[in-house]
C-alpha cells in the first residue's frame, strides 16, 4: 500500500516542469492547467495566544501533529495558555527548524501549540489536506530547504515570509479535495494494516508463551 501511495503521488501531482498531472480523475480531465500561486496567497500566518482548557499538540517528523501527552517526553502538559499559540482545526502548523524535513501537520482539533511553530491559516479555495500531501513531495521539500535560512543544516529555519515566497502549483478546490480524499483513504488502510499486524504479533507472542 505504501508503494502504491508513492506511485500515485508521482502520478496525481504534476512532474517538475509540467502543469498538469499524468493521471487525473475523469471529472477533471478537461479542467485545464494547475495554476502556480505564491504560498503567501494560499496561507496567512495567524498568531493568537493560547486559550485555557485546550489540549497541547506537538509536531512530529512522521506522524504530523500529536497530543503532547502521548509523547514519551516529560513535559508539563498544563502549561500557561498565554505561553502557547492557539491553532484551529484544519490549519497547518510547522516547526521552523525542521520544516525542510517535512515536520508539519494538519491541526486535527482546536488546540494549542508551541510559540516556536508557524501556524498557516488556509484562505478561500485552499484544502489543507491536499497541501499536506503536496508539501511532502521530494521536490517540495527541496523548495522548503532552499528557502530556509541558516549556516548549517542543523540551524536551518523556515520563517513565514520565506515560506510565503515559495511558488506552489495547485488545481481548483474541488480537485484538491478529490486528491486529498484519495490519499486519506489509502492512509486509513495503511493504519488499519499496521494495527492488524501489531495485534497478530501480540497474539503470536502470547501463543509462544
What is each of the regions a protein language model found here?
Residues 1-33, 169-209:
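Amphipathic alpha-helical coiled-coil/heptad-repeat segments
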Residues 75-81, 152, 185:
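Short, solvent-exposed loop/turn positions at domain surfaces
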Residues 70-71, 81-141, 145-148, 154, ...:
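A short beta-sheet element
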Residues 59-73:
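Short, basic/aromatic beta-hairpin or loop at an interaction surface
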Residues 22-23, 52-60, 147-148:
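Short coil/turn segments at secondary-structure boundaries
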Residues 26-30, 78, 118-123, 165-170:
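Short, well-ordered beta-strand elements within core beta-sheets of diverse protein domains
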Residues 24-51:
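Non-catalytic DNA-recognition/assembly elements of restriction-modification systems
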Amino acid at each position: 500500500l505504501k508503494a502504491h501511495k508513492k506511485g500515485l503521488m508521482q502520478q496525481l501531482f504534476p512532474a517538475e516542469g509540467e502543469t498538469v498531472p499524468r493521471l487525473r480523475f475523469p471529472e477533471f480531465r478537461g479542467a485545464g492547467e494547475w495554476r502556480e500561486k505564491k504560498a503567501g496567497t494560499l496561507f496567512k500566518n495567524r498568531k493568537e495566544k493560547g486559550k485555557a482548557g485546550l489540549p497541547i499538540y506537538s509536531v512530529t517528523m512522521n506522524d504530523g501533529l500529536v497530543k503532547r501527552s502521548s509523547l514519551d517526553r516529560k513535559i508539563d502538559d498544563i502549561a500557561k495558555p498565554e505561553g502557547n499559540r492557539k491553532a484551529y482545526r484544519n490549519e497547518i502548523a510547522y516547526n521552523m527548524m525542521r520544516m525542510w524535513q517535512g515536520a508539519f501537520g494538519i491541526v486535527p482539533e482546536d488546540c494549542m501549540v508551541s510559540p516556536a511553530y508557524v501556524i498557516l491559516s488556509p484562505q478561500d479555495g485552499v484544502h489543507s489536506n491536499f497541501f499536506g500531501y503536496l508539501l511532502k513531495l521530494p521536490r517540495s521539500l527541496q523548495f522548503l530547504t532552499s528557502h530556509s535560512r541558516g549556516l548549517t543544516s542543523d540551524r536551518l529555519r523556515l520563517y513565514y515570509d520565506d515560506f510565503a515566497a515559495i511558488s506552489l502549483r495547485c488545481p481548483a478546490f474541488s480537485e484538491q479535495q478529490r486528491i486529498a480524499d484519495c490519499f486519506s483513504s489509502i492512509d486509513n488502510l495503511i493504519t488499519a494494516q499496521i494495527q492488524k499486524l501489531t495485534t497478530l504479533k501480540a497474539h503470536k507472542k502470547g501463543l509462544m508463551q
